[in-house]
Amino acid sequence: MSGSKAKSRELARDVALQAIRTLYLAAVDAVRRGDYELARRLVAEADETRRVMRLRKPRFLRRGVCRNCSLPLVPGVTARYRLVRDGSVTRLVVTCLACGYIHRHVLVQRRRGSR
């Protein structure tokens, strides 16, 4: 790949990521106003932009959107966040208040016995 072609691809990738972030933030604002359908459409548009550009899903889309109902997860509005300690593992448990789907993310996994 030539240098200018790689640069233009990188520039297009950066512009697409900015557009995806802007759409996600607009979806979060729509949820705070109570317009859930607009928020879903904005998230779908952000995901479509990501697919067209063949990008990995950014972390804020992986963790900030419900997999079941495609609604942005806003603490206290559409999501409940809890920390659960289970033996040697600490998990972040996010419950979508719109559909009830439960997301579990491992935060800390402590090792036993090794010093």
UniProtKB/Swiss-Prot annotation:
Domain of life according to the entry: Archaea
Cofactor(s) annotated in UniProt: Zn(2+)
Catalytic activity: Endonucleolytic cleavage of RNA, removing 5'-extranucleotides from tRNA precursor
Pfam families hit by this protein: Rpr2 (PF04032)
Annotated residues for binding of Zn(2+): 66, 69, 96, 99
Alphabetical GO biological process terms: tRNA 5'-leader removal
Coiled coil ranges: none
Keywords for this protein: Cytoplasm, Endonuclease, Hydrolase, Metal-binding, Nuclease, tRNA processing, Zinc
MF GO annotations: ribonuclease P activity; zinc ion binding
Record text on subunit structure and interactions: Consists of a catalytic RNA component and at least 4-5 protein subunits.
Protein name: Ribonuclease P protein component 4
Organism (species): Hyperthermus butylicus (strain DSM 5456 / JCM 9403 / PLM1-5)
Gene field: rnp4
